[in-house]
UniProtKB/Swiss-Prot annotation:
Top-level taxon of the source organism: Eukaryota
Database matches in Pfam families: AAA, AAA_lid_3, PEX-1N, PEX-2N
Native organism: Mus musculus (Mouse)
Identification of the protein by name: Peroxisomal ATPase PEX1
InterPro entries assigned: AAA+_ATPase, AAA_ATPase_domain, AAA_lid_3, Asp_de-COase-like_dom_sf, ATPase_AAA_core, ATPase_AAA_CS, CDC48_domain_2-like_sf, P-loop_NTPase
UniProt subcellular location: Cytoplasm, Cytosol; Peroxisome membrane
GO BP annotation list: microtubule-based peroxisome localization; protein import into peroxisome matrix, receptor recycling; protein targeting to peroxisome; protein unfolding
Length: 1284
């Protein structure tokens, strides 16, 4: 009975209801609340009423007297129902319409002459209450309108603009009413009409009706006058009054004036009228673009239309133009519409909008925003309008309505005119037809707006002006100007700006509309031109109105050509920049391809790359760019950040197609850096901002806006999960990651940076080898190259002793000098470990292991190009296993130093954390650090602690760590320039999945050293020690079975201590002079102050030392502060505390002062002044007070002081022959006895039983089949096992 496919815009749901007639004085459909909920109806939504007749469309309201148990009954006014062909009790099908067009203009006709007369009498009442009676209209509908409580009239809907099956009346909709007179032959209308279907009526009563031909609007608070409904007010009854009601009269009948113009100027006026009558210009809003249309690019068109005030209008699909396009020229008025941000700035300055207009400015319905007359600027410009592709503009109406676009097409305005009118690029303007009859000026006045050359006179200016008029206007296409114009004339090979003023003889008439004048070369001959040579007062230079982006484009950046092409492809499809995109995605919602996310490390060039994409989109797609610097918003209140984002999104929607750039989005909508901050205020604010951003994007998707979104972030995972989640709205569907550049890309970046900074080609520097520099700049990013080039330029200027860049010559040596001491940004926050200054010659034994490491790591690092051509996959992971102390960690450091790569050492437990996800994040961060520092060696020590077999951990932490390691070691991306080394003594505990090919695929066994290897180890370790002639390392190697490399090193350390103790203490002391068992510890000896209060402070001669023992100068005993730490090493930290922590000079006065009565020469240093008059005393740690020294103690102390003297003199370079003959190091030579003594007290770290266990364990690890053939293991109840 009812067709479900009658309207493409109808919704899918519906309901069958019974019609009931009421006496309600409106045209609404009254529905019960239950039915409203069932149909999911929205306010002001249209409803299709389908019956046996043609479907109709009505607006609805909720009936107040319905109860919840009411049946499906829809009530409607009796007169409305009868006109729609319905009867009470009929069943109809209701279906909600998903898309309702806001009407800009509606043409209606009273059904009879009586209705027209009643309408004239109640015009004011109708303009106040019309929207309370009807909201949804459709062509050919006949509806009743109540003018009071008892009286109603019928009107018929003729046409809607824009053309649609149905539409909604708004507060700013123009309503054009055709008069209905009683004259029998009143239907004789001419064929001419404008684009809105306006017709002309001639009759006896036309002048009588002119009093009511007033331009009214549906809202009485507005002060605007619709420019499209103006007419010549020279009719009886006075001037037109502004209101919101548009009565259709003789809009385009430029009828005879009360005082007609003479024959002078009749050709120009006739051409103007003919042009306006033949063309059917479209009234609407257009977007200002920067690309010239074909009418402005062609030579012939430019000569006629491009000389003065001319606007070129063309449809969105300008690619469909022919080689020689056709265009139509009319005259019109252009006025700028304020954007939401400009309205907000205007309101801040004190200009308050009416309440309802504020609501419209906040409404998401862009149609209401675009047609809001209060947003128009007060000053309109009269100009020529060149319509390119007029038929395409008419046909584009349906396309633009389906996408809910703000603008019907594009308009190009010359820069001079655009800046004079203060219209920025990508602004929105309204163009309306010029319907007033132009006047003939009686005189013209020219006055320069700037100083003219002294030799310029009035006749010169008149001649130039006459030539300008002849080029800009013809008789058939006259020049239309307003009362005040600005023109540019060529004076003395330069353009000078003049002010052109017109004077009309009939100035006594006060006209509401703006008077325009017609001008041509013929008329100029009869018009007096007055020239004033005195310049006008120059206005202040206005600020730049256009938003300027950085000049860097994608072509000027190096190393990102592939990423740039992919990103631009995405943005082009998102903004429907190609015909195929328009055909495939025209009916898809906004953000068609999703947003673009650009990620990369610090200094990788994310912001520069994103701005270059925006620049490319602005140049090629004519897109508006709105940039939001999230770094500047960081730390501000949530409301301020949301407001900044809303302003950017609203501006982008107003000026669409647009691109929004959210730079450093992770700073305001990111994840906390550590799990402890998940509930911090910053994390809560980031979560709320992420949800708010999602809501804004959903709104753009629902409205179908032509807006593309670009965001930058360090990592995709650093954004809030709601923005990158796979569920819900897919915000970022394209992710471009800026990887560290390879050598070829580094060369391109260097080339582009040098070219951008110096403005010259790289061929001007023959001594500059960029490929050589690129090889030395591993791990450099874009910012590093910028700084490096600056340093190289500084080095070159310093070398040439010049400050001028014109004579600058860059060479490879300048860059090499700039690289010295320069640390790239990627390595500044990376905790790199500098390996010890060791080489392969410092390692004894392990020849096979060393060769494997050289072939796997060192050679590929030194010759990367050679190994890159090999047809095999290079190994990047090696596991070193063996007993403790066999040199696994030492090998990792040596191979890092020999290969010249960066070295990152990780101890296993430092990656583990109690927070869920923190351990996996720590693993990811380690590999990110390694990638940033590549070429790099990533060394995991104690690998079994972080990668045990899965299934043995109750918490599951290590299981997740193993899974993360598997992903990082052999993921989809793979490791480039990162070698992974792992060391363990228990390879059987490591998860076997990590040891499979592609991960740690090479397991290298580091065995305990045999006798030959032990001899090599002893030889290498003893190179830095002083060995006596009797040392036999071969014998030591033979008697140190089961010793590892670490044990042999400890053995040599112990032997060195034995030699030191044997030299310090006499052989006659008990236990070999062991300082640990004797009270003769050097650290316990102090020199007491003579004024310390002790009774023994001035001991007698028996307790004193021999004077020859202390025959040292003051400079020898107490050196300066920089070398005083050596003295504290022997006398302990208590030495200063006993003396009050004094300075060296104070110490000398306290420790070595003596009464003047004692003056004796020291035999050991004849000729020296005495330094001591009191004898040192000795205090043991277990005793209180002081104790006299024995002869043996004096001898020991004498030997120790001799050693101190020798060490100090050897360090200070003094002659050591005074008190100690021979070199000092001979006293510390390690003898065979020392080695044997140390060997007696040293045992291997791995016992014999433990060695057998390790050997069996490693044998089973190397031969898994042998382990399987062994007897089965007995498992106890509850024991956890793994199948790995």
């Amino acid at each position: 009975m009812w067709s479900s496919d009658r309207l493409a815009g109808a919704g899918s749901g519906g309901a069958v209801v019974t019609v009931a007639f009421t006496n309600a004085r409106d045209c609404f459909l009254h529905l019960p609340r239950r039915l409203v909920a069932q149909l999911h109806l929205l306010q002001n939504q249209a409803i299709e009423v389908a019956s046996d007749h043609q479907p109709t469309y009505l607006s609805w309201v909720e009936g107040r007297h319905f109860n919840d148990q009411s049946e499906n009954v829809a009530e409607i006014n009796r007169q409305v129902g009868q006109k729609l062909g319905l009867s009470s009790g009929d069943q109809v099908f209701l279906r909600p319409c998903s898309h309702v067009v806001s009407c800009q203009q509606v043409e209606v006709e009273p059904l009879s002459a009586d209705d027209w007369e009643i309408l004239e009498l109640h015009a004011i009442s109708l303009e106040q209450h019309l929207l309370d009676q009807i909201r949804i209209v459709f062509p050919k509908a006949v509806v009743p309108i109540w003018v009071d409580q008892q009286t109603y009239i019928f009107i018929q809907i003729v046409t809607l603009m824009p053309a649609a099956p149905y539409g909604r009346l708004e507060t700013n909709t123009k309503l054009l009413i055709q008069p209905k007179t009683r004259q029998a032959k009143e239907s004789t209308f001419p064929k001419e009409g404008d684009a809105h279907g306006q017709v002309h009526s001639y009759g006896r009563e036309q002048k009588g009706l002119s009093k009511e031909l007033q331009t009214r609007q549906l809202h009485t608070n507005s002060e605007g006058i619709t420019a499209s409904n103006g007419r010549d007010p020279k009719v009886p009854g006075g001037p037109l009054k502004p209101s919101w009601w548009a009565v259709l009269g003789s809009m385009l009948s430029f009828g005879p004036d009360s005082k007609q113009e003479s024959a002078w100027g009749s050709l120009e006026l006739g051409a103007f009228k003919n042009m306006q009558s033949q063309a059917a210009p479209l009234e609407g809003t257009f977007r200002v673009c920067q690309v010239q249309p074909p009418s402005a690019r062609t030579t012939t068109a430019t000569s006629v239309f491009h000389k003065h005030c001319t606007a070129h209008v063309f449809p969105w699909d300008q690619e469909y133009f022919d080689v020689e396009p056709s265009f139509t020229v009319t005259y019109g008025k252009l006025v700028k519409l304020h954007s939401p941000k400009q309205q907000q700035d205007k309101s801040k300055q004190g200009v308050l909008l009416p309440d309802k207009e504020k609501q419209l400015s906040k409404s998401p319905d862009h149609k209401q925003i675009s047609s809001n007359r209060s947003e128009e600027a007060a000053e309109a410009c009269v100009l020529k309008v060149v319509w390119n592709g007029l038929e395409e503009l008419k046909n584009a109406t349906e396309f633009t309505e389906s996408l809910e676009l703000l603008h019907r097409g594009k308009v190009w305005i010359p820069d001079d005119l655009r800046k004079r009118l203060n219209i920025e690029m990508h602004a929105v303007v309204r163009i309306t037809p010029l319907e007033t009859t132009p006047k003939i000026p009686r005189s013209l006045k020219l006055q320069p707006r700037e100083n003219l050359p002294k030799d310029v006179n009035e006749e010169t200016i008149k001649t130039v002006f006459s030539s300008w008029v002849q080029q800009s206007a013809t008789t058939m296409l006259p020049l239309v100007i307003s009362k005040e114009e600005r023109i540019k004339l060529e004076i003395k090979d330069g353009l000078r700006e003049f002010s052109l003023s017109t004077v009309h003889s009939q100035e006594k008439e006060k006209e509401e509309g703006k008077t325009v004048f017609v001008l041509s070369s013929i008329l100029l001959q009869k018009i007096s031109v007055q020239v004033l040579l005195e310049p006008m007062i120059k206005e202040e230079q206005s600020a730049e109105i256009d938003f300027l982006l950085p000049s860097l484009t994608l072509s000027s950046l190096g190393g990102v050509s592939a990423l740039g092409a992919s990103a631009m492809e995405h943005i082009t499809h998102s903004l429907l920049g190609r015909p195929l995109s328009r055909q495939l995605m025209a009916l898809v919602a906004g953000l068609r391809n999703g947003a673009l996310l650009i990620t990369g490390g610090k200094g990788s060039g994310k912001s520069t790359f994103a701005k270059a994409i925006c620049k490319e989109a602005q140049d090629t797609l004519d897109a508006r760019v709105e940039t939001v610097d999230c770094k500047a918003l960081r730390g501000k209140r949530l409301e301020s950040i949301q407001k900044a984002l809303e302003v950017a999104f609203s501006e982008a929607a107003w000026r669409q197609p647009s691109v929004i750039l959210l730079d450093d989005l992770d700073l305001i909508a990111g994840l906390p850096s550590v799990p402890e901050q998940e509930h911090s205020p910053e994390a809560v604010q980031s979560q709320r901002l992420a949800h708010a951003l999602n809501d804004m994007i959903k709104e753009f998707v629902s409205t179908g806006s032509l807006v593309a979104l670009i965001a930058t972030s360090q990592l995709q995972q650093s954004l809030h999960p709601s923005l990158v989640s796979a569920q819900g709205i897919h915000t970022f569907q394209c992710v471009q990651h800026l990887q560290p550049p390879n050598p070829e890309q580094r060369c391109e970046i260097l080339h582009s940076v040098v070219k951008n900074k110096l403005g010259c080609d790289i061929s001007n520097f023959p001594d500059l080898d960029l490929q050589c520099i690129a090889k030395d700049t591993e791990a450099f990013v874009a910012r590093d190259f910028t700084v490096l080039v600056d340093r190289a330029i500084h080095s070159s200027l310093s070398r040439q002793h010049s400050s001028s860049r014109e004579d600058l010559t860059l060479t490879t040596s300048d860059f090499q000098k700039a690289l010295r001491g320069f640390l790239p940004a990627s390595l500044r926050n990376v905790n790199l470990h500098k390996p010890r200054d060791l080489g392969w010659d410092k390692i004894g034994g392990l020849h096979e292991v060393r060769q494997i490491l050289m072939d796997t790591i060192q050679l590929p690092a030194k010759y990367p190009e050679l190994f890159a051509n090999l047809p095999i996959r290079q190994r990047t992971g090696i596991l070193l296993y063996g007993p403790p102390g066999t040199g696994k960690t030492l090998l990792a450091g040596v191979v890092a130093r020999e290969s010249g790569m960066n070295f990152i050492s990780i101890k296993g437990p430092e990656l583990l954390s109690k927070y869920i996800g923190a351990s996996e994040q720590a693993v990811r961060d380690v590999f990110i650090r390694a990638q940033a520092a590549k070429p790099c060696i990533l060394f995991f020590d104690e690998f079994e602690s972080i990668a045990p077999r899965r299934g043995h951990d109750n918490t599951g932490v290590t299981d997740r760590v193993v899974n993360q390691l598997l992903t990082q070691l052999d993921g989809v991306e793979g490791l480039q320039g990162v070698y992974v080394l792992a060391a363990t003594s228990r390879p059987d505990l490591i998860d076997p999945a990590l040891l499979r090919p592609g991960r740690l695929d090479k397991c290298v066994y580091c065995p305990p050293p045999d006798q030959v290897s032990r001899l090599e180890i002893l030889t290498v370790l003893s190179k830095s020690l002083a060995l006596a002639d009797d040392v036999d390392l071969q014998h030591v190697a033979s008697v140190t079975d089961s010793f590892t490399g670490a044990d042999l090193k400890a053995l040599l350390y112990n032997a060195q201590l034995e030699a030191l103790q044997g030299r310090l203490l006499p052989s006659g002391l008990p236990d070999g002079g062991s300082s640990s068992d004797s009270d003769l510890s050097l650290s316990s000896m102090v020199f007491l102050n003579h004024s310390s209060g002790s009774d023994d402070s001035a001991g007698d001669g028996e307790c004193g030392l021999e004077q020859s023992l202390l025959s040292l100068e003051m400079s020898e005993i107490l050196p300066d502060e920089s070398k005083f730490n050596m003295y504290r090493l022997y006398f302990g930290s208590s030495y200063e505390s006993e003396l009050g922590n004094g300075t060296p000079s104070d110490l000398s006065s306290h420790c070595l002062s003596a009464p003047s009565s004692v003056t004796q020469d020291l035999p050991a240093a004849p000729g020296k002044d005495p330094l001591f008059t009191q004898h040192p005393v000795f205090r043991t740690p277990s005793q209180e007070g002081c104790q006299d020294l024995t002869q043996e103690q004096r001898d020991q102390l004498r030997a120790e002081i001799s050693i101190i003297k020798g060490r100090y003199r050897s360090q200070s370079g003094e002659d050591e022959s005074l008190n100690q003959p021979g070199p000092i190091k001979t006293t510390f030579a390690i003898s065979q006895a020392h080695l044997m003594t140390a060997l007696a007290h040293t045992r291997p770290s791995i016992s014999e039983d433990e060695g057998k266990e390790f050997a069996e364990l490693y044998e089973n690890f190397q031969n898994p089949k042998k382990r399987k053939n062994q007897s089965g293991t007995v498992f106890r109840t509850g024991q956890k096992v793994t199948l790995a």
